Amino acid sequence: AEAKTAVRVGELFDAMGALSSQPGDAVRRRDVLSRAEDVASSFRRDAGVLGREMTSIESTSRDQVDALNKDVQQIAKLDQEIRQAVAGGGGNDLIDERNRIVGRVAEQMNVQVVNGKDGTVQLVTEDGRSIVEGGQAREIKVQKNNGVLSLTLSGVSGDQAIAKPGGALGGLMTAHNDVALGALNDLNTRAEEFATEMNAAHSAGFGTDGATGRNLFSFTLGAGASSFAVDAAVAGKPDALATSGTGAAGDNTALRAMMDVRDAGLPSGGTIEEGIRGIQQKLGTTIADAVRNGETSESSLQQLDAMKSSVEGVSMEEEILNLTQAQRGYEAAMKVLSATETMFDSIMSLKS
């Protein structure tokens, strides 16, 4: 499916082409402004979809971290009980209960499990930070800085970033930061560059009312897509649409200058329509990658589950570790896939 915003931009340029043969035609001038409004609303809509998806991902991340912290605290509490029970020659039921919770934690993020001689465990992140050790747990937090989500671990010297969380939470971080925020940043850049080029041509031209120096579009820097609008000086005012480069009736050089923007390369590369379609293509590639990663991890899960069921009476530590890693990969891939499919369907107008 074609990206709706790219279609709307194309329709605007087509309307300008129709106006160029009769630049004073009031009906065609109104049509150009109507198409410009369509472009603006489409940019705002896409930004809104991305913004809502980011809010949803952040909310899900915070909920899952709350549940994760409860599990981590429970592991630490059980370890305190396990240490005493093991010293007295028991503790198997407590260990089984704790291990089930460790499995849940491992689905949420990458952790290495180090078994202690006293029956307790140490849970260590991929970058070497202890979450649980010696019956003590550290708090995991979701932080947001300049729109970017990250996970941190509490410490005596302050919160420390978890570089590679992995698992379901790692998938959510990727979906938020790399996919949704990345697409929004690209969309903002394209919107701002497009408006800037169109405004340069429009402000140099004259409307049929004889005035000049007016922008066609307005936007807020850094939020170009969500704030994109037809400038108030032109909106709903066909006579204010600049078509003449000289002020003379029948001249269309200002209109032609705006039409030239269609095929001109923007600073970020490619034309405006190519750039918007590029965002669509990037989301499509992300979906394909997530599906492939999920299928690979699911295959590993099936193999390891079968192995775990068929082998008895031997140490299964390595197999269980591999199984947990496969679960993490599957969870991460599915989180990215779910979020990206929602954005792809909505932004690229499969549901509009």
PLM-predicted stretches and their roles:
Residues 1-352:
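S/T-rich, low-complexity, solvent-exposed segments of bacterial secretion/appendage proteins
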